[in-house]
Amino acid sequence: MISGQGTKNIAAVAAPTKHSALEGALFAAFMAILVWAPLPFASNREWAGSLLTLLLAAVAAAWVALWLAGRAQVHPRIWRRAKVPLYILLAVQAWVLLQITPLPPAVIEALSPRAAAWHVREGWLTLSLDWAATHYYLLRGCGITLGFFLMLALVNSERRVRLFLQVLVFSGTAQAAYGAFMVLSGLELGFFVEKYAGRGVATGTFVNRNHLAGYLVMCLAAGTGLLLSQLSRQRIHGWKERLRSWLRLLLSPKFRLRLYLAVMVVALVLTRSRMGNVAFFSALALAGCVALYSGRRFSWRMVGFLASLFVVDMIILGRWFGLDKLVERLEGLEGKAAEEFSRYWMDFYTLDYIRAFPFTGSGGGSFYGIFPNFQGEQLRGFYLHSHNDYLEFSAELGLPAALALVAFVALCLWQAVQVQRKRHHPLYRGAGFAVTMAVIWAAIHSTVDFNLQIPANALTFVSLLALAYISGNLPRNKAL
């Protein structure tokens, strides 16, 4: 997308200038897109995914026009550090483009003998065995990559970092309130239509409860990081001062934020998503340990805050809003051997799938059409996706591209940990916590589900990953 002299110019070190009104409007438009993405079935329909990419491309094109006019630029320090993960995303999209590029049969046979054998037409062939699906996959992937770039380009001040986190909290709270209301009222509506799946559990405007759970965890990560940045660092002496502190808390925006987090936890429990809930509390605990380890000194306030999330959310809120049913579902794993074995066999057969296309993959988005060729008699039914993001990326894109995506996430996680170790600014440290928690959630939940194949969740995830580089390299109280 950007190379050569343009790479140097886009982050040219110039005298800091104030944000132009147009650039501010683009930031607002990008935030609106982040809120829109989960609404039309999590953008997991071709029309919705295409519209999402079109909206992101329009904002990116407008930003480039401002850049060419000298009225916008990526912060130099952010660009210097974040261009490597951006290039990794671009390289993956270039690989998907190659998958749908017609090549001589001899080249296809050398790169992917199985693909060459399975093609039924003559002439030049493609590495992808489903050209249309991979074409849409590329379109969607370009949109996700644009989302990562727009974060780097537009979230360029302390105020915008805070606003970005607040936008995710707002969107997550809205999804949570809507999903919980639909369950508790019995209306059972999704996105302007009656739900045809997930009745009796919270799904919001998503179709799958596990994907709403994943989205809520990312929004909870943003809210938790925001709340951590607001922890008081003043020492309190005496019961009168402590009472005044509690009264100030009840009247402060911090208390409202805590209520929003509670609403999201209620909806998370109401999804009855086993791994969604397990991944949330595991990610919260592990990210908390990372934050405590990264801190310059042990913080009892942070320990108390994290403990309050566990105690209040799990015992009190969960008890009122169906934690017992979630626990029954977790305990009922032994009685659902068939379901668990179906996941085992899916993973088993997907490994055979990967062995057939180890280097090139079968083409982005082609899993639904190729997997039946490897599906044995132990696994019945039709599957659009593997219930394992790691395996699906490997099967469709090939192992090298899948490892590149793992490297992309690992780089962002490392940067998030460094933010918590080296930065003093509480907001940026809170943002680093949010990224760390989101990555740990994805690492856990991706073993049993396909959250990252859902456009809204993938866009939200890469936006949070970009925040690691933003919070690690923005100067304090300064912006371009």
Task: List the model feature ranges, each with a label.
Residues 66-98, 103-105:
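Helix-loop-helix transmembrane hairpins and adjacent membrane-interface loops
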